Design a protein with these regions (language model features):
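Cross-family detector of peptidyl-prolyl cis-trans isomerase
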Residues: 2-157
């Protein structure tokens, strides 16, 4: 009798374990939400403007208020891509905005983020000399790469 009870319990444990594995497997197949940049203004610039430093930008969505200063810390959502379209970094992947001091990022970000107001969105084409230069970032950004960013400035902290 004891042996039959143990076998019955083992059978139920096997069924429960299999059911749990199936549920977890199904949950792994469900696509997680993908966060992407918000909408651009209908009248957003289609052409890039180039600054004297070589940074190219276009305002995709106007914000309100004063833009950040080079010494400010900002909260942003962003995606960074190489010229071939491959994504090398993104806050959208985690669904959590990032915080950066503009004095601690590549020069192209420091300059570019000062051109957009909170609530706004900007597209930046950062030449190598304002990005990671001739060295790049091993395993992520090739030497001499132009960096392409879409950045939503959520707020100045």
């Amino acid at each position: 009798m004891l042996a039959q009870g143990m076998l019955a319990r083992r059978g139920w444990l096997a069924v429960a374990g299999g059911l749990a594995a199936a549920i977890l497997g199904f949950a792994g197949c469900v696509q997680q939400p993908t966060f992407r940049p918000g909408p651009a203004d209908p009248d957003a610039a289609s052409e890039f403007t180039q600054t004297p430093s070589g940074l190219r930008y276009r305002i995709l969505r106007k914000g309100e208020g004063d833009p950040p200063k080079a010494s400010d810390t900002v909260r942003v959502h962003y995606v960074g891509k190489l010229d071939d379209g491959s994504e090398f970094d993104s806050s959208y992947r985690t669904g959590k905005p990032a915080e950066f001091s503009l004095s601690g990022v590549v020069k192209g970000w420091t300059e570019g983020l000062q051109l957009v107001q909170p609530g706004g969105m900007i597209e930046l084409q950062v030449p190598p000399e304002l990005g990671y230069g001739r060295d790049g970032v091993p395993g992520a950004i090739p030497p001499g790469a132009t960096l392409n960013f879409t950045v939503e400035l959520i707020e100045i902290l």
